[in-house]
Amino acid sequence: MPMHSPALPMLHLMRLVSPSQPVGAFSYSRGLEWAVHAGTVTNEESCAGWVFGLLEHSYAVLDGAIFWRMISALMRNDDAEFCRLNDWLGASRESSELELEDRRMGESLRTLLSELGVERARSFASEQRATYPAAFSIAACHWNIEPVDALRGLMWSVVESQIMAAIRLVPLGHTAGQRILIAGAAKIERAVEKARTLNDDEIGNTAPALAMASAWHETQYSRLFRS
């Protein structure tokens, strides 16, 4: 394949969203483990409701919307705005576990990118702990991934990670997990459109169930996941 092939950015995106990416995503459930323990998520239907509810009311209006602005800031070489957005997103996590998950995955990806020779990841201020969307946006810009495709990839990776956790926790069969992912394709596209069209004063939303599930998970007696 020619090095300038237009397919290369998409192939890099596929690698970025792959579950084999060494960022530790398999260790986290984002409160889903408590939701299963509490009987809120018990089957395929309730799992889909939980995952897609958070996609619409939390990830799209916070992570996705800020990620969209991060990409724009990087393309303008506006490092100050990029750092401001990273701080904003990091400060928006509603529990210590959610913040720790985001920072650990973000720093893992940033470190990986640095080792792969991505200069922007290397130059990210040492005192500035990268959120995962920030590190993802650096990767997307480096490999010339179209911003809207990068946003789709980020939203897809969030949903897929939740489904993989649900397969272990509920438990769901793998076929049920695939049914949820197939049904989620159109929902992800709507989340992408919502994230990229929000005004600044519309960014952010309260997801009480996520916040409480994550906080309760911190003292849950028996746990498979870190969040």
From Swiss-Prot:
The keyword Cytoplasm applies. Pfam families: UreF (PF01730). One of its GO terms (molecular function) is nickel cation binding. Keywords: Chaperone, Cytoplasm, Nickel insertion. Gene3D superfamilies: Urease accessory protein UreF (1.10.4190.10). One of its GO terms (cellular component) is cytoplasm. InterPro entries: UreF, UreF_sf. It is found in: Cytoplasm. HAMAP family: UreF. Required for maturation of urease via the functional incorporation of the urease nickel metallocenter. UreD, UreF and UreG form a complex that acts as a GTP-hydrolysis-dependent molecular chaperone, activating the urease apoprotein by helping to assemble the nickel containing metallocenter of UreC. The UreE protein probably delivers the nickel. Belongs to the UreF family. This is Urease accessory protein UreF 2. It comes from Brucella anthropi (strain ATCC 49188 / DSM 6882 / CCUG 24695 / JCM 21032 / LMG 3331 / NBRC 15819 / NCTC 12168 / Alc 37) (Ochrobactrum anthropi). The gene is ureF2.
